[in-house]
């Protein structure tokens, strides 16, 4: 095309320069000025990488003065264009705008504009964009969205609770599973769903101080949720950045002590507009009707301000009725306002539980029993279902299940309380204790004697703590460099045990980090034993590396030496041998230690080895834990209660372990108390609640469907393609692991989620569970979500041109592949994507407007096409521009029908589902007061807003590909 002064052109290679103007032309070169950047470019006339900018009738253009005009006619005179049309601001018609006065800051965002302006993408980017649209739309429609992305085993009861609660509006529930059943994971799953769907954006987690890092690690490692830890220092820093320091972060963890210590701080927390509040160890919030504790009042104040509340607590049976009522009162003070009334209500649930047991037993029901069930459910048309349940037909079982669901919906606290017990959940290993009694070395005997004389004024508790760790008493006198490990028989025993069990992974836990470090040195220097160390002085990354080394099967560490605090929140269920080098001070810590291995999914029985020194507090404690509480070989829900009741007596025996008079009686009393309390807990078990919390076959089916999704090969292919196009290096490390590192030619200089040093990823859930240094990649992982955003929020792949070698079609035959997106705009919390996610509609049109998309599948067609370089592509586009315009108009006429069908289907689905949920809850409200008014109001409001948003839904062209047939 000839160049003329004043013409407007755009650079094919530097589109960011905007619109250029021809300012000089000679026989061989042309010079363009780009006014928006003030830069000049000199090109060869014969082969310049620039494209002539020509607008068509119907386009909207902007003048350099900022006003806009709709083009109605285009005139050309001496190679220069003049556009004639109507100004949009003044509605003046017949206005002429010469091309030299076009706005230079021109950005082509519509696919067709980019194509005609020569901004042609690589063919593989177009394919990636379409796949991104397709897979993204499919993922939103998955019924278990938000439950697949976490690095956890697929345990049915956890998935059941998370699926139920995570989909509610502002859930307010009590999670009261027995220890080891994964309350933290359930809470994390609920958070993950709520954050992913947009139902929540700001979350506050309040935990005891010692558990802050555990939660921080769990949320990051398992759910890719990056929380900020607020303490006094962080709070003071944040005060410089915002009036309310908590407004500086969306996801916050702080301790209960931190929250209640300062009145101003608590006010700031209450004013920070959280969507969800999570409180761990909520059973420690002391309450009585007359004197609630300050901690309880602080949480009560917060719970009044935050719409969603999750309380993690001990089981109701352990808490006692009053304490259990106090937790429920935090969730719904209007419903749970009278303790006496609550006690009476609980008694009335017994017949319901009996009715459920009766239905599940499968026996024929008498007429009286059928009548009782009918009255309890209170539905007018319940008779056919009752008859079906009592028949011999194939439908009897499903009818009984439906009746059980109806009963559970209508009675009890099942909407606000979830509690699973080990009795009701399969998959736990046995625990076997091996105690090793060892002589007390003379060096320790001397140190203990001297310490007793010098510390005569110490309290019994301090002396008891000292006596648990004789090596520390010895070091106090001999200095930190004292080589206690040279004579401590526990060290000798440990080395012997490890060398004779070389093939076993062994977890060794001791109270202090210093002990772990000293043991590592001894094992390495004396026996060449590979041991990783894990303690609170290490960063999270260092701990990850240590855990990963321990997890490696062949070349990894045989031993992981953990300190008490360092191992919090970490699970190593691939190991089944544990050595307690010393013993913790209370039963909760003991259970926490064993809980590192005793998890659902543990494949072997757990071997617990306790080498202890006679005539020390260890020998007292090992007997009390084992004979008094049976705490080594079984979980001990009674431990804390008994510990508190015999504390003073126990402390005296620990402080003076040589004075054992009456100790046998103490153990006997504790065992009797333990058995009585256990029987009491068992009797008080709420079977109705157990059935509801467990989820039964429904939960099993949910786990299986997610497991099937884990094997989705589309994800792996898409992710690799995505990483290639973004410019991320991939290095296959074997064992289903890949290392990703940034390259020098990335689409964006800093890709979120990819550190400078790179990351290790896996698509295999089992590998991710065993290797904490490998990130588990699913459709829900931030790396994939950020990649989808990067591709879909920009114009990557939105316009391209390809050649189709097909001798059955005439040379030069034109096809245009159009990707439309049907979507509705709405606030994220409406979760409109459940019904109408941005949905791609593909068309493949010929010159006559025939849509061949149904006959020609995308991937098959894509494999038949060949790429065209940008320069040749620009020439092709210019040659067929008028034809492409005509095909685009035919596409616009056809998309309306397809889009309307999608929108109508979404409206019907939304109306049906949301109306049904509202009707169900309104019906239940009459018989179950645990359904909150605000929940009903929210569902009705949500339904109205969803329907209004769907009424406003529309469509747009997202990408197009021009295909030209060739025979070469």
Curated annotation (Swiss-Prot):
**Main role?**
Transcription regulator that activates transcription by stimulating RNA polymerase (RNAP) recycling in case of stress conditions such as supercoiled DNA or high salt concentrations. Probably acts by releasing the RNAP, when it is trapped or immobilized on tightly supercoiled DNA. Does not activate transcription on linear DNA. Probably not involved in DNA repair.
* UniProt-recorded name of the protein: RNA polymerase-associated protein RapA
User: Which molecular-function annotation in GO is an example for this chain?
Assistant: DNA binding
Q: Where does ATP bind?
A: 177-184
Gene symbol of the encoding locus: rapA
The biological processes this protein is annotated with in GO are: regulation of DNA-templated transcription
Q: Which CDD domains match?
A: DEXDc_RapA, SF2_C_SNF
Which key words are in the record? Answer: Activator, ATP-binding, DNA-binding, Helicase, Hydrolase, Nucleotide-binding, Transcription, Transcription regulation
Residue ranges of the Helicase C-terminal domain?
490-662
Question: Span of the secretion signal?
Answer: none
Q: Which superkingdom does the taxonomy of this entry point to?
A: Bacteria
Q: Which family does it belong to?
A: Belongs to the SNF2/RAD54 helicase family. RapA subfamily.
According to the record's subunit comment, the protein's assembly and interactions are:
Interacts with the RNAP. Has a higher affinity for the core RNAP than for the holoenzyme. Its ATPase activity is stimulated by binding to RNAP.
Q: What class of enzyme is it?
A: hydrolase
What residue intervals hold the motif DEAH box?
Answer: 280-283
| EC id | 3.6.4.-
What range(s) does the Helicase ATP-binding domain occupy? 164-334
InterPro entries registered for this protein in UniProt = Helicase_ATP-bd (IPR014001), Helicase_C-like (IPR001650), Helicase_RapA (IPR023949), P-loop_NTPase (IPR027417), RapA_C (IPR022737), SNF2-like_sf (IPR038718), SNF2/RAD54-like_C (IPR049730), SNF2_N (IPR000330)
Q: Which PANTHER family match?
A: DNA ANNEALING HELICASE AND ENDONUCLEASE ZRANB3 FAMILY MEMBER (PTHR45766), SWI_SNF-RELATED MATRIX-ASSOCIATED ACTIN-DEPENDENT REGULATOR OF CHROMATIN SUBFAMILY A-LIKE PROTEIN 1 (PTHR45766:SF6)
Q: Name one Pfam family in it.
A: SNF2-rel_dom
């Amino acid at each position: 095309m000839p160049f003329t002064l004043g013409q407007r052109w755009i650079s094919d290679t530097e589109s960011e320069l905007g619109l250029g103007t021809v300012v000089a032309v000679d026989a061989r070169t042309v010079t363009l000025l780009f006014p928006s950047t003030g830069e000049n470019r000199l090109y060869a006339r014969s082969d310049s990488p620039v494209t002539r900018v020509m607008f068509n009738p119907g386009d909207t253009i902007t003048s350099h003065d900022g006003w806009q005009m709709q083009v109605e006619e285009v005139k050309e005179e001496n190679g220069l264009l003049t556009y004639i049309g109507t100004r949009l601001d003044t509605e003046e018609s017949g206005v002429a705008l010469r091309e030299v006065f076009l706005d230079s800051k021109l950005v082509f965002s519509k696919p067709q504009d980019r194509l005609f302006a020569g901004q042609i993408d690589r063919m593989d980017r177009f394919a990636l964009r379409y796949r991104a649209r397709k897979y993204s739309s499919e993922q939103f429609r998955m019924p278990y969205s938000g439950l697949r992305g976490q690095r956890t085993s697929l345990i049915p009861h956890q998935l059941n609770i998370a699926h139920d609660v995570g989909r509610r509006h502002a859930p307010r529930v009590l999670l009261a599973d027995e220890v080891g059943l994964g309350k933290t994971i359930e809470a994390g799953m609920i958070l993950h769903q709520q954050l992913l769907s947009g139902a929540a954006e700001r979350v506050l987690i309040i935990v005891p101080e010692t558990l802050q890092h555990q939660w921080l690690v769990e949320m990051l490692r398992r759910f890719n949720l990056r929380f900020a830890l607020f303490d006094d220092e962080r709070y003071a820093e944040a005060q410089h950045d915002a009036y309310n320091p908590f407004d500086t972060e969306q996801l916050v963890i702080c301790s209960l002590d931190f929250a209640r210590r300062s009145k101003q701080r608590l006010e700031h927390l209450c004013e920070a507009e959280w969507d969800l509040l999570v409180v761990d160890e909520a059973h420690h919030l002391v309450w009585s009707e007359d004197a609630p504790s300050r901690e309880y009042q602080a949480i009560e104040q917060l719970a009044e301000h935050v719409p969603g509340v999750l309380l993690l607590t001990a089981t109701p049976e352990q808490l006692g009725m009053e304490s259990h009522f106090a937790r429920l009162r935090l969730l719904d003070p209007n419903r749970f306002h009278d303790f006496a009334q609550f006690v009476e209500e609980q008694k009335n649930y017994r017949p319901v539980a009996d009715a459920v047991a009766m239905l599940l037993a499968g026996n024929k029901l008498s007429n009286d029993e059928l009548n009782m069930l009918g009255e309890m459910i209170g539905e007018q048309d319940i008779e056919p279902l009752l008859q079906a349940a009592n028949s011999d037909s194939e439908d009897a079982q499903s009818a009984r299940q439906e009746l059980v669901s109806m009963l559970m919906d209508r009675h009890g606290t099942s909407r606000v309380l979830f509690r699973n017990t080990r009795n009701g959940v399969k998959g736990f290993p046995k625990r076997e204790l091996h105690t090793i009694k060892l002589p007390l070395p003379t060096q320790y005997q001397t140190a203990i004697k001297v310490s007793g004389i010098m510390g005569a004024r110490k309290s019994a508790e301090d002396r008891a703590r000292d006596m648990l760790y004789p090596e520390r008493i010895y070091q106090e006198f001999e200095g930190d460099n004292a080589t206690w490990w040279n004579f401590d028989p526990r060290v000798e025993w440990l080395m012997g045990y490890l060398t004779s069990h070389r093939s076993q992974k062994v977890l060794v836990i001791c109270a202090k980090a210093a002990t772990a470090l000293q043991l590592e040195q001894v094992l390495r220097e004396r026996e060449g034993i590979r041991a990783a160390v894990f303690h609170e002085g290490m960063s999270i990354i260092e701990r990850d590396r240590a855990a990963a080394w321990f997890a490696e099967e062949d070349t990894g560490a045989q031993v992981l030496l953990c300190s008490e605090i360092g191992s919090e929140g970490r699970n190593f269920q691939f190991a089944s041998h544990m050595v307690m080098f010393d013993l913790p001070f209370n039963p909760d810590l003991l259970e926490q230690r064993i809980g590192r291995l005793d998890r659902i999914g543990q494949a072997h029985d757990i071997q617990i080895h306790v080498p202890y020194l006679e005539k020390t507090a260890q020998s007292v404690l090992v007997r009390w834990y084992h004979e008094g509480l049976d705490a080594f070989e079984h979980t001990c829900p009674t431990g804390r209660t008994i510990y508190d009741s015999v504390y003073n007596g126990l402390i005296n025996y620990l402080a003076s372990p040589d004075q054992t008079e009456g100790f046998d009686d103490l153990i006997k009393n504790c065992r009797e108390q333990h058995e009585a309390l256990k029987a009491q807990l068992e009797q008080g078990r709420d079977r109705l609640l157990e059935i509801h919390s467990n989820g039964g076959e429904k939960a099993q089916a949910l786990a299986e469907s997610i497991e099937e999704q884990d094997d989705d090969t589309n994800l792996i292919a898409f992710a690799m393609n995505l990483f290639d196009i973004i410019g991320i290096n991939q290095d296959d490390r074997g064992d289903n692991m890949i290392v990703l590192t940034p390259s020098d030619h990335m689409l964006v200089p800093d890709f979120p989620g990819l550190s400078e040093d790179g990351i290790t990823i896996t698509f295999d859930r089992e590998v991710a569970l065993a290797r904490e240094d490998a990130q588990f990649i699913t459709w829900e992982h931030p790396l994939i979500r950020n990649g989808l955003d990067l591709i879909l929020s920009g114009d990557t792949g939105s316009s391209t041109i390809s050649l189709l070698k097909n001798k059955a079609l005439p040379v030069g035959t034109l096809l245009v592949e159009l990707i439309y997106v049907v979507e509705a705009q709405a606030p994220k919390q409406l979760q409109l994507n459940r019904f109408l996610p941005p949905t791609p509609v593909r068309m493949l049109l010929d010159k006559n407007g025939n849509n061949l998309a149904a006959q020609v599948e995308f991937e098959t067609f894509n494999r038949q096409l060949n790429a065209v370089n940008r320069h040749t592509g620009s020439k092709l586009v210019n040659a067929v521009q008028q034809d492409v315009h005509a095909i685009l108009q035919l596409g616009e006429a056809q998309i309306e029908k397809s889009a309307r069908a999608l929108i109508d289907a979404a409206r019907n689905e939304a109306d049906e589902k949301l109306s049904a949920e509202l009707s169900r809850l309104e019906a239940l409200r009459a018989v179950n007061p645990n359904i909150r008014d605000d929940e009903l109001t929210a569902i009705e409001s949500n339904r109205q807003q969803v329907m209004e948003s769907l009424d406003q839904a529309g469509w747009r062209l997202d990408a197009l590909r021009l295909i030209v047939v060739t025979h070469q």
